[in-house]
Amino acid sequence: MEIVRAATMRDYQECLRLFLQAHNENDQFSLAPDKLHWMLTRFLNPDAIPEDDPGLRGIIGVIGREGGLEAICGLCISDLWYTYDKHLTDFLVFVDPEYRTTGHAKTLTGWMKTQADIIGMPLMSAVVTNHRTEAKCRLFRRTFPKVGELFLYYPGSLTAGSSLSRTAH
């Protein structure tokens, strides 16, 4: 069975590689490299976050050795607009294409549930992709109770990866 471990700063380049691969495969919006760097640095080195910093907290779980990651999952603590109740939400579950037949995705979703159990927070997860969507949804339906669906509309001629996120401030 694969072992999911918490990524560290030593995994930065490999995490970045997998995040960029995931964006290339699943992008719905343009990439903001500075935001990605900020988040990776923050999640890979949580001890550097000041205690009074109210910003985003999370963890990145990985499968594979240092310098050769095979799969990655990102979780962060969040809340919904109508409550202060916290929950975990995933922002990435991705398996390198070379390792897609290994069961890593199932291992990562199990790890996500374990993290929710450890900290005692509900876990909210979504599949946001146009690539192999149905297969991913089947895995998530087998793993998590369904509580809704997610839809995305691009007005007019705007399409996924458009400049929408750069122009709507």
Regions found by a protein language model. Give the residues of each.
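Conserved GNAT-fold acetyl-CoA-binding loop/helix
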Residues: L20-N45
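A short helix-loop-beta-strand connector motif used in the catalytic cores of GNAT acetyltransferases and
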Residues: T41-G61
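Conserved beta-strand in the GNAT
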Residues: V62, G68-I77
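A short, internal acetyl-CoA/4′-phosphopantetheine-binding micro-motif in the GNAT/acyltransferase core
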Residues: F91-T102
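A conserved beta-turn-beta hairpin within the catalytic core of GNAT-like acetyltransferases
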Residues: D79-D90
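Conserved acyl-CoA
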Residues: T107-L123
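A short beta-loop-alpha structural element at the N-terminal edge
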Residues: M1-R17
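Conserved beta-strand-loop-alpha-helix junction that forms the acyl-donor binding cleft
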Residues: M112, M124-K136
